[in-house]
């Protein structure tokens, strides 16, 4: 009860509150509890200090804060801001402290972070009955230029397949709460030896997303790809021969996602629910609707 009262008064701007319970016996089995609250002075945020961000720009952290200089102190917004910063996936530790300015009704808020490694380099090798010997290289940076932008490049090469994927995401496109990104891909598969044909895929995907309310985001996308099956042998299966030529796939995607996970990269608590609807058509060679529901915890 004391903590709840303290939290509620803190949300009203009283950062330094003293709550004292007074217990009075009023019967054999009853007591009366009175809480005496000393609110003190209403506190306002004078300055926000950011520290520990060696690579990351201050703006990346500040835009996740739900309070600004001049606001009344609010403990709920402090906790919410910490969760938002953690949700970027750029930091191992986040600590927000208040530093009372003695003799005034103002306080400084110190936001301290410990950056995590955001660059990744992966190399893989293996064997597949479909593609033969496989090798892959992946490069990814999740904090490009210290602006939380994400860039990744994946290259795959095998005996019968080559693949390249390039992806870029800006979580605050045009300095607005609008994530935007693009994926470009090209896949070439040579199945002449075993199946008597070649298959090429080339295309791109445009992505956007924004927050509707806290934790609920809307996503939209447009995908355009071209499949080409060619160089077919005469003895190839009738099924493959029927697919010879070029096919265009055009997809408009929409999704709603509610995310309560406590960390985007390594979550330890919470859950995520996402509902996707993809509309195939819009000039493509296939027309149908695909829906998908995903739940993770």
Report the location of each language-model feature.
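A translation/RNA-centric and nucleic-acid-associated enzymatic feature enriched
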Residues: 296
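Amphipathic hydrophobic-ligand
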Residues: 14-18, 135, 160, 201, ...
């Amino acid at each position: 009860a004391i903590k709840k009262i303290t939290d509620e008064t803190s949300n009203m701007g009283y950062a330094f509150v003293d709550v004292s319970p007074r217990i009075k016996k009023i019967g054999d089995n009853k007591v009366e509890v009175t809480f005496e609250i000393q609110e003190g002075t209403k506190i306002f945020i004078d300055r926000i200090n950011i520290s520990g961000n060696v690579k990351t720009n201050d703006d990346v952290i500040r835009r996740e804060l739900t309070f600004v200089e001049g606001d009344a102190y609010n403990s709920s917004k402090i906790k919410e801001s910490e969760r938002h910063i953690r949700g970027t996936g750029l930091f191992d530790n986040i600590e927000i402290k208040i530093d009372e300015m003695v003799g005034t009704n103002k306080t400084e808020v110190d936001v301290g972070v410990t950056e995590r490694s955001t660059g990744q380099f992966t190399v893989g090798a293996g064997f597949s009955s479909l593609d033969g010997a496989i090798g892959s290289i992946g490069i990814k940076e999740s904090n490009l230029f210290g602006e939380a932008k994400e860039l990744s490049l994946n290259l795959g090469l095998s005996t019968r397949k080559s693949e390249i994927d390039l992806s870029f995401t800006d979580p605050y496109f045009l300095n607005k709460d609008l994530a935007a990104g693009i994926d470009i891909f090209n896949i070439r598969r040579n199945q002449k030896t075993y199946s008597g044909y070649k298959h090429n895929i080339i295309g791109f995907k445009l992505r956007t997303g924004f927050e509707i309310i806290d934790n609920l985001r809307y996503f939209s996308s447009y995908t355009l790809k071209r499949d080409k099956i060619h160089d077919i042998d005469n003895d190839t299966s009738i099924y493959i021969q029927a697919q010879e030529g070029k096919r265009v796939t055009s997809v408009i995607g929409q999704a709603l996602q509610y995310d309560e996970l406590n960390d985007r990269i390594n979550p330890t608590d919470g859950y995520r629910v996402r509902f996707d609807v993809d509309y195939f058509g819009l000039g493509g060679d296939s027309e149908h609707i695909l829906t998908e529901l995903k739940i993770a915890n």
